[in-house]
Amino acid sequence: MPSFDTVCEPNLPEVKNAVENTAKEIATRFDFKGTAAAVELKDKEITMIGDAEFQLVQVEDILRAKLTKRSVDVRFLDKGDVQKIGGDKVKQVIKVKSGIESEQAKKITRIIKDSKLKVQAAIQGDAVRITGAKRDDLQAAMALIKKDVPDMPLSFNNFRD
């Protein structure tokens, strides 16, 4: 029986490259000379540091541009609050989402079941497996998921025939 998995996983090497390119651009830009502006990636968390909140906005704009250039969906980013750290510096942590949360997985299975397609959806950890008798039904399920869940960067893998 044909099946596929619906997952939400970023291309982490490309995220790392985008963060490194952002750090290089910060180091060479004239408006960041002599400031504490920095960006770094540690364990699926991007930390941005700046002298003021407007600098964090500029660093985030650069980061988003670099991610987009490297074909990484910016919906993977989950911004945290701006925190004041020692002196007059501010910091913001951006988490890189990975995996489908349980309530999102339940939403996807509910969408599949309500669609009356001849497919079954099962939650398996941080992925949703869709199984059906025909390949056409699976393709219809893919189109339905992409249309009805626009707020998550979902991808489909592990196709079985």
From Swiss-Prot:
SUPFAM superfamilies assigned to the protein according to its UniProt record, in alphabetical order: YajQ-like
GO MF entries: nucleotide binding
Domain of life: Bacteria
Presence of the UniProt keyword Nucleotide-binding in the record: yes
An annotated GO cellular component: cytosol
CDD domains: YajQ_like
Keywords associated with the record: Nucleotide-binding
Alphabetical list of InterPro entries matching this protein: DUF520 (IPR007551), UPF0234-like_C (IPR035571), YajQ-like_sf (IPR036183)
Function: Nucleotide-binding protein.
Stored PANTHER family: UPF0234 PROTEIN YAJQ
Family per record: Belongs to the YajQ family.
Protein's UniProt name: Nucleotide-binding protein Vapar_3769
